[in-house]
Amino acid sequence: MCKNILLIFSFALTISAFAQENVDSLYITTSDSVKLFVKRSGTGYPVLFIHGGPGSNSYYFEKEGGDVFSKDVQLVYFDQRGCGRSDSSSLNDYSLTRVVKDFDEIRQKLGYKQWMIIAHSFGGILATQYAYEYPATIKAMVYLNCTLNLPYTAQSAIMKGLEFLSNNKEDRKYFLNDSIPLLKRWGDMFDTLRKERIVYKLMFDQAQSKAYDDSLMSLPFLKYVYAQKLWNYSEYFDDFSPKTSQINVPVLVISGTRDYTIGVDHYKLMHFPNMEVKLLEGAHALYFEHNKELYEAVTPFLRKYSD
């Protein structure tokens, strides 16, 4: 395992050294006066990375191997409002409509007529809403281990977590009790697995990967305000999969065969008219633990639509 992690680090450092030659960072102020951190890496056709969480930041993808794609396209990283290195909203506005409006204001400020999207995890919900509201701005999209239905994802994590807990009778009694709110049981499952030191199994193949990710996400300059606020907006817990049938841009869906955080069959809920699906061996962090395989699966798609 240690050897595999060292190989991942070595490959990521090589890509980082390449990308540093073509990197610029800036802050873009939205129409409601929120300063968003934006970073461009590489050259070529612009590709917006929409991070997950909910309410995480783009730092994990960049530092855990995602920057490999900057060899072929220009990755546009940004931290969503109230996330990472971006400011919080003074108006306390974290509504879905406002968040996706941020995406398009970034596009306009950077001067792109169109761009592609790579969305990860919870970013799938945001990407779907963005494509639904601003269809003319998107050339193509990559959905990387994305959810379009948070309740479905919560249920998937609970069921797999019970397997990891050996289907203990008392655990099943609590976690399958529908009188307890689903989101509470979801959070409690993560807490229970964390106490047992096996929470990594929902997201990663290796415990070392989770430890490294935790070390990045706990850096003091990263904020998590959006992660706290979005739970007050019921709209985020809708089922977004019906909207996929109305989104006509080319879509590549990547799903990890061991992505128990999202659900290994979640991709079957997606019905984009122009969709290609690729299943890759691995968990939720394919960009980190299976970087080479992910790069080889996604890059031909990016190149195809980069004209």
Q: Model-found features: residue ranges?
A:
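Conserved hydrolase catalytic core segment
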Residues: 113-157
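Catalytic histidine-centered segment of alpha/beta-hydrolase-like enzymes
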Residues: 283-295
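Flexible "cap/lid" loop of the alpha/beta hydrolase fold
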Residues: 141-179
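Short beta-strand/loop motif that positions the catalytic acidic residue
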Residues: 247, 253-255
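Conserved acidic catalytic loop of the alpha/beta-hydrolase fold
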Residues: 98-115
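Conserved alpha/beta-hydrolase "acid-adjacent" motif
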Residues: 260-265
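The serine-hydrolase catalytic nucleophile loop
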Residues: 55-66
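Conserved alpha/beta-hydrolase
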Residues: 69-87
